[in-house]
Amino acid sequence: YIDKETMILHHDKHHATYLANANAALEKHPEIGEDLEFLLSDVTRIPEDIRQALINNGGGHLNHALFWELLTPEKQEPTAEVLAAIEDAFGSFEDFKTAFTQAATTRFGSGWAWLVVNQEGKLEVMSTGNQDNPISQGKQPILGL
């Protein structure tokens, strides 16, 4: 359960600010385009004068966009395909939940817990600080908290 005030704060303040700041940075270099996933997948593509702004704010936008996309008012179970991949990677769904909870609760300061697909096509749990997105490490996020 996440209370209404927390949701409003994250949507109307945090996410809106990340998006505005990412757009402001991109306006300084229209030649690089606006595909944040592409840019963050290799941050050397981003001009140095806006690199950290895009890592922070572009990452914050992508992180929150995925978070909103995955929210649902009702409890949902993973599909058979996802459950099989989780069991292959973690042994059981309970072991996955333990690993994900540990990633979320042991992050010092601000950050995210992730279920990602790594470069080998396998699922893994990881944590990133602040608004860093796993895309910058060559991993595709599929669940973030």
Swiss-Prot record:
Keywords recorded for this protein, A-Z: Iron, Manganese, Metal-binding, Oxidoreductase
SUPFAM superfamilies attached to this UniProt entry: Fe,Mn superoxide dismutase (SOD), C-terminal domain, Fe,Mn superoxide dismutase (SOD), N-terminal domain
Positions that bind Mn(2+): 10, 64
EC number(s) from the headed UniProt entry: 1.15.1.1
Binding site for Fe(3+): 10, 64
Transmembrane segments: none
Protein name: Superoxide dismutase [Mn/Fe]
Gene Ontology MF term list: metal ion binding; superoxide dismutase activity
Xref: InterPro entries: Mn/Fe_SOD, Mn/Fe_SOD_C, Mn/Fe_SOD_N, Mn/Fe_SOD_N_sf, SOD_C_sf
Leader sequence segment: none
Cofactor: record remark: Binds 1 Mn(2+) or Fe(3+) ion per subunit.
Function text: Destroys superoxide anion radicals which are normally produced within the cells and which are toxic to biological systems. Catalyzes the dismutation of superoxide anion radicals into O2 and H2O2 by successive reduction and oxidation of the transition metal ion at the active site.
Source organism of the structure: Streptococcus alactolyticus
Cofactor: Mn(2+); Fe(3+)
Gene this protein is translated from: sodA
